[in-house]
Amino acid sequence: MIDSISEETLIVKSYTVNHCAKNVPVFINSYDLTAEVAKNEDVRLARQVQISLEKIDEVIESIFSASGPSVENVKDQAKFALCRLLLGPVSIPCYCEEWDVNFYLTKCSYNCEGPVLYIYKNASQCCESTYRFSIMTNYHSTHIFRGLLSLQEWNSHLSNILCTCSNVTGDKYTATIFPNNASIYLEYYPYFLCYLCKHLSIIDIEQCTNELIAFLGPKTSQRIIIHYKLLFGFRSKPMNFTVSLLEQVFTLEIQKLYYSVSKHNSTTADFFNVITAKFAEDKYFVLRTFKLSAQITPGIQSFCSLKFKLQTLYLNLKIMKNTKLSISNSFYHGKTLYTLDEKQLVWRNLLLIYYGYNLKDNVKQTQEESLLSMHYIRILERLSLKSFREINQQFSFEIPSYQEKTLQFIPGGNDFAEITSVTHGETTVNAFNTNRVMNVKAALSGEIHCVLHRIPKSMTHSFVMYKRTFKEPSLTVSTFISNDDFTTSSLNINIRGPYCDFLYALGVYRLHVNIQDFFLPAFVCNSNNSMDLHGLENQGIVRKRKKKVYWITNFPCMISNSEKVNVGWFKAGTGIIPKVSGTDLKNVLLKELISIGEIPNITFDMDLHALLTLLEKRNMHQVPFLIKQFFMFLRLGLLVGYGRKQERKVHHIMLFLIQKGFFDFSKNSVANSKIKHACALVGSRLANNVPKILSKQKKMKLDHLGRNANALTVLRFIVENGYYKRKTIFRKLLKYLATTSFNAHVQTESNRLLNLMHNDSKTNFSSLERLYTLR
């Protein structure tokens, strides 16, 4: 009673489908399990059924979900779904007791002379499969598995519903079965095509079909072609388009275009109001223009360049000027041909409606009459046997192994990442952005018209009219203006920081100038990055590579060419990478790491390398000179005190201090001002003034040894210049480096410094003896 009441009161019938597909073999030990019921199932598939779009959407979504988690691209999922649909439906009969039936089995009885699966619950739990099975002959079936024919490679990620622990020989073909409420009929195929066309073009579908035929061979080609024709097999002819129907289509399209515009103002309101007014005045003219082919190139009658530039900005139209009159999707005004992007044909036609147009006499007669014949010829070319049999190797029929990815969200994309990390083997390098140069389009407010007389007529489009510098946030903005750009301008912005800082800088800039709107996204035309190689024991070896490096005379660094980008290497393992960002930057870093790893006798202190890279990632900034020296000598002192056997304990101590924030620092207090955006603050001359220290009445820069100088470099400078006071401490440090390092250069250099200190001690002792004798 309760069930009948619930069925009567249910207003919308639910078609919720379980998307969990399973794998069932169609060949077992040379037995074809599908042959017995193929004819009867074909009759069932071909019968007319009631069409429910909700049910069809659920079925095709379950087919999409069978692609597996490793196929993340929707287009690839659509291709795998298409391949399964081309191989077509398949059914496998079986005998099963009622208490063992689940929702993958459909009740259906056939008398089978050939093989029938007898399935029963897997009580042994030898695997995750639901059923065990045996093969019977001359018996009737009680239930049936229904799904789509597939290949073993496509179903490698799907769980088997039958236990195959015993020695069972199969075939490359298998079945992807779905729950019994996801039945597939041939009447659904044209509707499946509508769903596939959301992600695939007709050319993609044809190429995928050709590749599948070439991959599987001629034996299955007829089966694939039949299901391919069923996809395009609408029985009912589409109704003829009437004027009222075209009016509805046009109104709907205008509404879609209106909502696709990101920002509305007086410019966009005027554009759509004029289109609507002309549609009310002359519907025939507007509808004819709306369907105008891209091959026809009309001429605009009245044209306002200032208004047109604002429309292209706010409507996000991609327009180029050309001189050829044979380019599609274009219109001309005077002698200038304006070409829009091939995907913006509707916008081209709306611009023609807005400004009005005329056609040449030969264009009116020739191009419109030959339009249908051109389409017919293209269809014949596309369906020709030669192009139909072409094989495209870009699409693979093997599903990649599943790897769970956790992508880091970066506002603005990878081009605006503050840090770019690349790992090769055990070596990791962190590249930090020092500054970016971006180009942005902007619309000016109406106040610009009061200063038009100040703009000289001799200006060109590449002339910098204004250059403004801001201290907070620190950026430099160069404005390019020409004598015909009174409403728009191009901005060249030099700034450092993430995407949020860039948006904040645009807001600050807008407060000081007559900018009405910025048009994002911005184009990053140049990006400079800096990196440090941590833990490198012999830092000079990076600048001694052959074949891939060369020196320049007017700049104190070595240039290494990687991916056609000059990577500059300073002393102490510090590098700079110009021009590139995002994925290109990662490729350059990886090539450079591979090149460095091929250097013979190169040695890294991997514990120190891991600690310093972790400190960089924690602070999202390069480690300053003083903090790094304090960190390295604190660790070196602990290693000397605890001994080499307690090296892991020292590593955990330093790791604990990093995690507790003992070595955290502020980005604004970095001593090396070269990595700050100082050029925008005080100019390039004062930007090179690095803070200095006074030692023995001499001024020295804090980074005179290099920001990334290691312990051996600092000890060499102190010992050779005699800046030490407690020799015992320096001897212990040098002895530890000489005995623990695996690098021959470090051992030799440490022993040399020890001998230098020993000889210096003898010299001082002999001078004291002579002084005592004289007294």
From Swiss-Prot:
InterPro entries: Herpes_UL87_C, Herpes_UL87_N
Parts forming coiled coils: none
UniProt similarity note: Belongs to the herpesviridae UL87 family.
Name by which UniProt lists this protein: Protein U58
